[in-house]
């Protein structure tokens, strides 16, 4: 966007500072000293990242001035600076007292951009924002946080990925395979992602019927637009 022209004049989309951001309210203590943020992590530094291109070409009026179908969305100079996270990625450890002592559960929170509303860049960024957490739980060494600490989640740590990820593992306009790969990873509790503990609701199934939805898992829908995007 153009400097001073909302909502596209910053790293993230918004009509005011903090729009579409998120907050955490916890019954248990948040380990703020060991909370990590990744707001400044650059997209180019994600393993496998490439400059997104214009791939949705049915409406050329949406193309940036002077660009055509197939062009790279960013110049090389822009790509060197652009951030991955459209809002923030946060690892907040929660300290939970148990009869055997304190147990730590890492809340991996984010709100990726929707895979829509432009000509292909958002599709790629949404997938990359979700893939970041997949690589994070694999403790990839290239990851760095906003304080300069490197590496991801240490082996054996408990975690919950949460937030509006804007990506359904089996339906929608996003790159569903990215969420499928995360769900299928042995590091993730398979009873939750592919088994009996997956959150479902009667309301979701009723909504699917009301909207004549073709979603293959209608009782998992979390949004009024008929997709399972919240975790």
Task: Spell out what each predicted region is.
Residues 65, 73-77, 117-125:
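Acidic/histidine-rich helix-loop elements
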């Amino acid at each position: 966007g153009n400097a001073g022209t909302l909502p596209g004049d910053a790293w993230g989309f918004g009509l005011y500072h903090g729009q579409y951001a998120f907050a955490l309210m916890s019954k248990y203590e948040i380990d703020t000293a060991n909370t990590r943020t990744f707001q400044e992590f650059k997209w180019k530094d994600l393993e496998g990242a490439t400059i997104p291109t214009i791939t949705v070409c049915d409406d050329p009026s949406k193309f940036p001035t002077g660009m055509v179908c197939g062009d790279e969305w960013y110049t090389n100079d822009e790509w060197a600076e652009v951030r991955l996270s459209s809002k923030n990625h946060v690892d907040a450890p929660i300290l939970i007292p148990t009869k055997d002592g304190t147990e730590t559960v890492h809340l991996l929170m984010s709100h990726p951009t929707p895979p829509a509303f432009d000509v292909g860049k958002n599709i790629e960024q949404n997938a990359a924002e979700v893939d970041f957490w997949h690589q994070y739980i694999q403790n990839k060494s290239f990851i760095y946080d906003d304080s300069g600490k490197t590496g991801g989640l240490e082996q054996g740590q408990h975690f919950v990925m949460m937030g509006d990820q804007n990506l359904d593992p089996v339906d929608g306009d996003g790159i569903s395979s990215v969420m499928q790969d995360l769900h299928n990873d042995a590091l993730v509790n398979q009873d939750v992602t592919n088994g009996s503990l997956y959150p479902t609701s009667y309301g979701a199934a009723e909504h699917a019927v009301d909207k004549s939805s073709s979603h293959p898992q209608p009782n998992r829908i979390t949004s009024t637009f008929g997709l399972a995007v919240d975790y």
